[in-house]
Amino acid sequence: MINKISKILFAFLFVMGLQSANAQTIRIASVSGPDHHHNKALNWFADKVNKQNIGVTFKVLSGGQLGKSERAYIEGMQQGTIQMSQVSTGPMAGFVGEFDIFSLPYMFRDTAHFKKVLSGPIGDKFLGMLDAKGMKGLAWFDNGYRNMFNGTKPVTEPSDMAGLKIRVMKSPLMVNTVNAMGGSATPMAYGELYTALKQGVLDGGENAAGNVLNDKFFEVSKYYSITQHFRPPGVVVMSKKTWNSLSGSQQKAISKAAAQL
């Protein structure tokens, strides 16, 4: 009897070992630093799925290890060279034009309004639009309100933007909004912004407080003004090539974990 149990246990461990050895590794690309709250959430997601031993292992590669721009990540996911990422709706609008609506200034009344829109049928409809573009939309992120920062002066009214060269995401609405405020909007990859500010190529940027703190933009910008002009969400996306390589049970487990982000 003991010998029989030993054989069963050995067979079980052998099969589990094979599953582990054959597990697919999915790398999640992120432009933000390792301590950024986005990556803390993505690591939570990865740990949650990894512990289920479904034959898929997730690994977050932060700090632009797979590229310095979210646009490059989106192109990579379409081509299948980037497996998964969390990107902003601003650059996504360059591939799915409807996403640019999230770059409208002062679009959401408050956090409750923001969450209600994205957690309902409207949010689901936008995630579904990614299918035709070679991507699978999994979940939304709250990136927070974006505020103006620069090294010259505080911004308390639109006229204060005059003469300021401000980095924005590559979104037509964002570019037009900052220009309408009197600034000079300059689309640039997020990973290049710190150096551009340090070298004086740009005067400032606009982003959420968490990003400014985590990526240390306060070292190269003196003023952070609470303008709350944009609140574009982030979207967690997987390449359709990667998604289609997964089994139905794996897809279900991943979707369930992503829904809790």
Label every model-predicted segment.
Residues M1, A23-Q24:
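Absolute protein N-terminus
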Residues G17-A23:
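Sec/Tat signal peptide C-region and signal peptidase I cleavage site
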Residues I8-G17:
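Bacterial N-terminal signal peptides
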Residues Q24-H113, P121-D124, G128-L261:
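N-terminal secretory/targeting leader peptides
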Residues M1-L9:
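Bacterial N-terminal signal peptides that target proteins for export
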